[in-house]
Design a protein with these regions (language model features):
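HIT superfamily nucleotide-processing domains
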Residues: 1-131
């Protein structure tokens, strides 16, 4: 899938976090600044097709990424959204939010490439500091 290629480095991305099992990167269509996708490196079509141990590890990784996002973007909460109809590869959307209106996938914010790079680097650094 496209997410497998991104996680493998075959397609460029703004990396926010990674480990042996999972990869997190900025969504190219930012709903809010800091909108991050978390994917398993192993191709799994649907999040609930993952076995229990994989799903638990996936959520723990996403939680750590969410904590890093909240460090960079002080907000009330980091929303976790699972949709998965566009790409047949399990993934979690993490979005900094201060109200439910911030999680409107019909709305996107324009974030220039240089700013996306800076955001990803800040989230990556915050993620590393949580180690």
């Amino acid at each position: 899938t496209i997410f497998s290629k991104i996680a493998a480095g075959e397609i460029s991305s703004y990396k926010c976090a990674e480990n042996e099992q999972f990869y997190a990167f900025l969504d190219i269509d930012q709903v809010t600044k800091g909108h991050t996708l978390v994917v398993p490196r192993k191709e799994v079509d649907y999040i609930f097709d993952m076995d229990d141990d994989e799903l638990a590890a996936f959520e723990v990784f996403a939680k750590k990424v969410a904590r890093a996002i909240k460090t960079v973007f002080p907000c009330k909460k980091v929303a976790q959204v699972v949709l998965g109809l566009e790409v047949n590869h399990a993934h979690i959307h993490l979005l900094p939010m201060n109200s439910e209106a911030d999680v409107n996938f019909k709305h996107h914010v324009q974030v220039e490439a240089e700013e996306q790079k800076e955001i990803a680097e800040k989230i990556f650094k915050a993620f590393q500091e949580l180690e």
